Structures are given as structure tokens and as C-alpha cells.
Amino acid sequence: MAGKQNQAAPKKAVAPRQQHYEFGGPIGAFGITFGLPILVHVFNLFCNDISGCPAPSLLHPKSLDLAQLKREIGWPDNGVFGLFSWSATLWTLGYYALSLVQYRFLPGHHVEGTELSTGGRLKYKLNAFNSAMCTLAILAAGTIAQGAEFPVWTFISDNFAQIISANILFAFALAIFVYVRSFDVKPGNKDMRQLAAGGVTGSLIYDFYIGRELNPRITLPLIGQVDIKEFMEMRPGLLGWIILNCAFIAKQYRLYGYVTDSILFITAIQAFYVFDGIYMEPAVLTTMDITTDGFGFMLSFGDVVWVPFMYSTQTRYLSVHPQQLGAFGLIAVGAVLAAGYSIFRLSNSQKNNFRTNPEDPSVKHLTYLQTKTGSRLITSGWWGIARHINYLGDWLQSWPYSLPTGIAGYQILSAGSNAPGAITMLDGREVVQGEARGWGIVFTYFYILYFAILLIHRDLRDDEKCSKKYGDDWEKYKKLVKWRIVPGIY
């Protein structure tokens, strides 16, 4: 169980109120808070397994008929209320309950986080990897016994929109809970609770979105104390992403009677990303998410809605429009992945070696700028190419998530259409690209665009932070290393 560490008494009261805004300030926070949940549903409805991706009517906006569009996207007869169901909500809550039970009873190890600005360190119980393996073992056993008809897989496919809604409601409820509870934070409290510097602007919607409390914790009956932010970041959403991918593999098999290499490839590399992250769970305790950002709707929604449901778009697409990459395709996409991974790992390794052992032969030759703060800013090697060359590697690794979908887009025709080049489902329906070819890229390649924006925003935050920390030295450094992420472009 997460615990408390009382090595040092809290020194300060709460974070001082400040008016520095990100994400477009209160207006941007309002738009994101209420716009992104709609966008997640739009992606599911407009790229569907009923009529196509995108829905055919969207290709002819001038003659768009709303009634026809509703039929094409499977809009519920009872309207928006049909996007909710008690069964999906209860099973979703059951999934969270299972995560909590695993957190409580599965073995793990206890570590301390970084020192808080108010003094002291929080303790964390880390067993996300064990929890994930336990859940996947249960799902594997069910799949071995019942194959693609395993009820978990069919329930996800049949209730996908309702599961999205259940998680959206949970994200809002959790964000409201921690926001209201954050006003109980008192100076010098024994639990070492504190407010996040960026979440006390005085704007209700902005602070609700960014998060007021830095490390909100809750004590639950039979479970004990849980660090909400660390728990949500490393458990239900990340594992849920892989569970959804597996559900779409099962769906492809039910629709066609086979599974393609493209959907397996995407699932494999995304699973590697997730398992690498949860296996290295202690590393998250030093990230900005844990040490600096408050826990609000941004992280609540991102953890349990945005990551699992938007990041699984490609496998959801391929479950309906199967693509075989073949040996050449797998090698080509794998090469992009290898290039990105190499840049990311080699650059980070070089920086880490330089910081921990600057006399190491592999980094001893590197030039650097000595700052007044005592830090050394590397100006050659990987870090002489761009100030965040590791971000370039990270971004390149996002491309293999989308490339296997090809020039995306498809239409679903009724059985017996006998369309040229059609892929026929087991129930006789036919899938063709037709005039939808290329338009599906809006959905399947969205992740690449989103991730680029995320990295650029992260770079801007880092630039501002370093400018305050290093002053004139940072300006000198930027003249020596001109490019931010992509040399010659940005």
C-alpha cells in the first residue's frame, strides 16, 4: 500500500496563486474539457463497422442528409442516452475494482518519490507489472477456452460506445472529486498534501482541468491508501489500451476467420511500449506528471479515455479493413521503428552517461556549455544536432502505429454486391476502399499529428523552464544548438 514518510516536516503552506496559463488558459481548458470527450465519440461513430471509415455521407457534405448519416453511424434510437448503459458502466467499474484488488494483494515493492517542495518524501507501492500480468493471464485463459467468442472480447466490441461513455463519466467524477477535496489541503498537514503551482490560478475551469492538488491520495476500505495519480497513470488506462487491441484482434477473426500481420504488428509494438513503461514503473516517479503537474481532468481523462480509446484506433480500423503487410512491409515499417527507437535510446543514453560519468570514453569528447548554475549543456554529439533530438526519435516511433493501415479508408457494402477487389466478411458483407480511399487517414494517422503537437508543446514548456533556470546561458546555448527537434526544419 502507498504510505506516508515523515522524515521531514512540511515546511510551507500551499503553492502561491499564479496567473501563468497553458493550453489557451480558461477558454482552452473549457474547450478541451468538453470538446475532447465529444471527439472520442466522433472518432468511433464516424469510423465504424456499419457503413465505413469515414461514414459515406461525410464524403458528400453538400448533399449531407442527417437522417441518412445517423443510420450510417448507428446512432441510437433514443439519441445520446443510447451511448450509455448500466451494464457497460458496471463492468467498467468492475475493471477498476479489479485493479484496486490487485494493487492491494499482489506483491510489489515500496519506494520513495522525489523530495517534495514542502519537505519529505511520499512512499509508493509499485506492482503495476504484476497486476498487468495477472489480468492478461485471466484473459489468455478465457481466450484459450473460448477463442474469439470469449465474452470479454465480444462485450467490448458490442458495447464500445457505452464503454467509452462510462470511462468519460468516471474521468469527470474523479476530476471533480479531487478538485473539491483539494480545498481541504491545509498548511503543515501531516499527510504532506500540497497544491501544484500551476493549478492555483483562481480560475475554476482552468484549475479543474490542470489539477489543484499535486499528489491526491485516498484511503479505501480493505485496500488502504492509494496514490490516485500514480495509480491512474500506470494501471487501468495503459493496460486497457492493450486489452482493447486484443479485443479487436478477436473481432477481426470473428469477421473474417483469420488475423492479419498488420494488426498483430501494431498490437505487439504497442504492448512492448506499455510493458516497458509499467516494468520500469519507478521511473515515472521522477517525471513532470508526478513531480510538477497537479491531478485534474487533463490527467484523469487522458489516463482512462484518451490513451486507451484513441490509441487503439488503428487496431479498431484493421479489425474491419484487414491489411496484409507481408515480409517487405513488415521490414519497412520495422525499419522506421528501429530508427526512431535508436535515436531515442542512443541520445538519452549519451546524455545520461555524460551526466553520471563525464570521463567515460564514449562521451569524454563531447563539447558543452558551462552554465552559471553549474550544469553542463551538451553542444555536440546527438545533442548538438537538436536540443530535443530524443523527441524526434520518440515521434518516429509513433509512425509504425499508423503506417500498417496504409492509405486508409473503406466502405461496407451489403452481401452479394460483388464489388471488384472487395474483401468479404464471413457474413457476406463486402469491404472496399472506393471513394473512401485516403479519407480514413484522418482517423488512423491522427495519432502522429497529435503526438507531434504534444512533443512541440513539451518542448516549449522545457524551453521556458530552462530559460528561467539558466538565463543568458540558455540564450547562448540556443545559438550553438539552433534546432529544437527536427534538424533543418524545427
Curated annotation (Swiss-Prot):
Keyword hit for Kinase: no
Keywords assigned: Lipid biosynthesis, Lipid metabolism, Membrane, NADP, Oxidoreductase, Steroid biosynthesis, Steroid metabolism, Sterol biosynthesis, Sterol metabolism, Transmembrane, Transmembrane helix
Segments crossing the lipid bilayer: 23-43, 80-100, 136-156, 160-180, 230-250, 255-275, 324-344, 436-456
Annotated metabolic or biological route of this protein: Steroid biosynthesis; zymosterol biosynthesis; zymosterol from lanosterol: step 2/6
Taxonomic superkingdom: Eukaryota
Gene3D superfamilies with a match to the protein in the record: 1.20.120.1630
Positions of NADP(+) binding: K351, R355, I378, W383, N390, Y391, D462, C466, S467, K468, K469, Y470, Y477
EC number: 1.3.1.70
Keyword flag RNA-binding: no
PROSITE patterns (alphabetical): STEROL_REDUCT_1, STEROL_REDUCT_2
PANTHER family associated with the record: DELTA(14)-STEROL REDUCTASE, DELTA(14)-STEROL REDUCTASE TM7SF2
Name of the featured protein: Delta(14)-sterol reductase
Provenance organism: Neurospora crassa (strain ATCC 24698 / 74-OR23-1A / CBS 708.71 / DSM 1257 / FGSC 987)
